[in-house]
Amino acid sequence: MSAHEHLGIEQLHSWLVHAHAACVRHGELLNTLNEFPVADSDTGANVTHTLAGAARALTQADVIDFADAATVASAGAVLGARGNSGMILAQCLLAFSESAQNAPSQGLRPVELVAALQAMARGAVKAVSHPVEGTFISAMRSAAQAGADTLDTSPRPTLEEITATAAFGAQEAVVETVGIGHGPVDAGAGAIMLIMTALADVFNPQGDLTGTALNMLTDLSQNNTSHKQVSGRSGEFEVMYLWNATAFQAERLRKALGEIGDSVAVGGAVDSLNMGLFHVHVHTDSPRAALPPYGKARQICIRRLRSSRPEPATNPYGFNARGGSNVIPLERFSSKRPAKAARKVQNEIGVIACTRAPGLIVPLARAGAVVVLEPDSDAIVRAAGDIQNPNAFVLPCDEASISAAHAASRSLTSRAAVWALDDSNLGEDILVAGDYISKSAGGVEALTRLKVADTSNEVAMFVTAMALGLAELENSSDLDEAAKLALMERTAWVTAVRMRVLEFSGVDAEHIALAVANALGEWTVTVTVLVGALVDSDVAPLIRDAVGQKAQDMGIDEDLDVNIYASHQDLDQ
């Protein structure tokens, strides 16, 4: 007789913990394998975040039965999900939870476990707009089919048998990804293999299928060659947010996002009123168009994935003070900013730019910042997780976001010692530190440290983000982490000291243009103008002409750059 009659609450928790621990230990391996649908090197991190959200939620909850535990874990996965792979995994766990609602209170027996695995496979397909073979989806389907075959053929199927064959099914799918077109090993398929072997090890720890799977992944990756992107239209930006909506609205949004981008995932669970919290993810060239047309989104984070075209982007108003060129200085460097595959955490300093101006999303992201639109503390914490760097500058845009940034910093610090897990099977301590997950051989490594800059308005935030982006680009390979951090701290300070911010309101466009021109000084090198949504369209050309003439009169026109942006924000609010 099997030692386990049910996959109960304890086993569910152990599964999530073991899977999370495996991904923490070998997330970098998954990251280096990540090329589909875009080489943003984050599958390992995204899956780890999602598993951490599920395990943390279950650890902290007081559940009454298995169905309740599965619901809590899946909800935590949705909130913790990052990226396309995290979204797919969260949708799988939601499907697992929905299947578990009809199970006995003690947990899943073999027949219910197979049904749950099959539901997860369907959930993986449902999570994406354009399912692709040889990826996350294939591995989950193969695992579910192997479990179902065991249920059909074994005279007395046990949980040990079903979980072991499901793990072997996932392993077979990983091997079959070789040569499909996106590299010898797909990172998403590899992640599912680790998750399924972790489940098998819960019921048979001596088997150590996870260790075998890790060795197999390592061996297969040794001959890893340059991957070919399967989809030819992966967007320049990744957009993620949480959104309260009905199932019908979510489906409409999914279809709309499919028209403007790919890697679309809209996942969530609805209640009896057909309302739910959905996690939205898309890769697109038009991040503003990816925002929902109705309802309120929160935790809106946007980051740049790659350059979609070699030529630099143009000024939103089509000019600068020099007349002949449409290119603004920041775009000259940001358009040449290389896509960074397999980014090393220790060599990067993250920048989180807070804004309430949708028109600034693209230039900020192209400067290398993770952009948080309509910031609050939860959104900033999420952005810190997306950065995956031990240090990050937060650039607030107003007094409210300054408070939110400090609250986020306190939140990350307080989470550092909340939940340390001893995974005896893997032999090391694992820490889930808020949304930045790290490990070290001797215990715990530092979580993301947030440094809040003194930027109290949109212009100060924007100019500082430009300066930090340029400093990071010019010194990306010459300095170690400590030196780079010191450089960027000084850059932010010098920028703040040398910056003069003017705010204008009213209907007299000529008066505003002259006021901007009269603010020029002998040492002025850059003028950045943010034009609000309610400002007349003739203000921008008037400012250009007035500043250009004044600069010429002062003899500084050859060294002066004027950048004018339509912020699409009511700056009077």
Tell what function each PLM region has.
Residues 1-573:
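N-terminal loops that bind phosphate or other acidic moieties
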